[in-house]
Amino acid sequence: TDTRRSNRSRLLQSIITRGPATRAELSRRLGLSRPTVSVIVNELLGVGVITEGDRVSSGGAPGTLLEISKRTGVIVVADLRSADIVRLSTISASGELVTTDEAPASGTDQVQSAVTAFIDRCEPQSVIGVVLCVAGLVTRGEWDGEGERDGRALALGLRRALRLPVFAVNAAEATAVADLRDSPGDVAMATVLLDHQVAMALILDGRLLSGVTRRTGDIAHIVAGTPGPVCDECGHMCLQQQLLALRTDPATATLLDAAHALAAVLAPIAAGVELTEVVLSGFPDAVADELAGLTHRSLRTRMLDEHVPAVRVSKRGPSAAMIGAAALMLYRLLG
């Protein structure tokens, strides 16, 4: 039935994005009865999609962890956020980084050659899909491209050459999915990602929100009203310029201005969608923790105390986007 398919999909999504769990934990996460969870689990065990792992106890009767089968294979992630380099990784079904490499590649053909050569050096028979991790808008797994890279031609060329599924995902959204493993169960989370630009992704009630004509978290050029450098692109002292300045000038005044700007942009979003957590990813290690604390304090001056979300630094490191991208691809293949 549709309900059973939906519950199966939700259960797989939970294991893929939030990590291994016992039957009891899955019942709590999904709000499903124990018998319903057991029926779905037995079906997935029977077809080899999931396997039973270690027995764990959280104070009650021990339970057995359920995880995605290691026999599922690996996913190749091509990080295309740099205009002239492609960073490549293989990620296991359990979300572990297996191998990494990078190659100079600016145009479509160069990227395709780099990806196919990387797969040839790995174990090609173990690869179950390729995901393109990009900074731009992704619509139903397709990316138009940017600069010298034609996203649709690249995906089509890789599908033909490799005979594998190839999809694109937005890097901020992928990072948010990776960060979800470290968040509480009932979470409304915003991940703010700083790399070549500023982007945000939203996860509400376990669901990733995606934009229609632009990225959901397109907050880069919002003007917060705090002093900062003028942006060449929009001509204003926008949030993106204030946060990018932290990479070259981590002075206290710059950090405080950045925190106030970030809080000014996040406060109405937090109030509007009941955010419980903000995660900062990609910020310089030297300032990330202090920025999180200052942003939280600034939010408290703009909102009711009971509405202020927690602000923390991502624990996933520079590989977060790749790990999250692989999780999104795996869910697309199995869910």
Protein language model features and the residues they cover:
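ATP-binding/phosphotransfer module of carbohydrate and carboxylate kinases, centering on a glycine-rich
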Residues: 1-104, 110-121, 182-183, 226-335
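Short glycine-aspartate micro-motif
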Residues: 65, 75-79, 127-131, 189-193, ...
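Short, ordered coil/turn segments that flank beta-strands lining enzyme active or ligand-binding pockets
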Residues: 71, 93-94, 139, 196, ...
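Short, acidic Gly/Pro/Ser/Thr-rich loop/turn segments
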Residues: 83-85, 137-139, 198-199
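Glycine-rich phosphate-binding loop and adjoining helix at the ATP-binding site
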Residues: 97, 102-188, 233-234, 289-301
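Glycine/GP-enriched mid-protein hinge/lid loop-to-helix segment characteristic of carbohydrate kinases
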Residues: 100, 148-149, 157-255
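Short secondary-structure boundary segments
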Residues: 134, 194-196, 277, 282-283
